[in-house]
Amino acid sequence: MLLLSSISVAEAADPTLLAETGAFLLGNAYRCGVSTERVTRAGNVIRGMIASLSKDAGEKEVAGARFSDRFRLSAYPAADRDVLTPPCSVVVTQFERLERRHREAGYTE
């Protein structure tokens, strides 16, 4: 649960940390049945934030790759690996909190 809530307090200047925590939440939200449209919308906001925080194209590319990797691992956890798979009730609550914060801050796609 700590990792899920860390997206709101991720180091503002660290696009890779934002990518990892954001993708962890979004991947798990997708796994838990949150609509593709909602996950995509939140992902677009997070990717935009990553782009604006990145110092250069290389940093943006690294963060983007981490986002893609972490999302895939969270959305489709392998049964044979020991991975953190939070309960869907927690994931959906945190995802809804993220959506609310995005709306309050005026973030759009």
Task: Enumerate the predicted regions with their spans.
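Bacterial N-terminal signal peptides
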Residues: 1-6
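Intrinsic disorder/low-complexity segments in short proteins, especially the signal peptide
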Residues: 7-9, 58
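Compact alpha-helical subdomains of small soluble proteins
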Residues: 41-109
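Immediate post-signal-peptide N-terminus of mature secreted/exported proteins
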Residues: 12-41
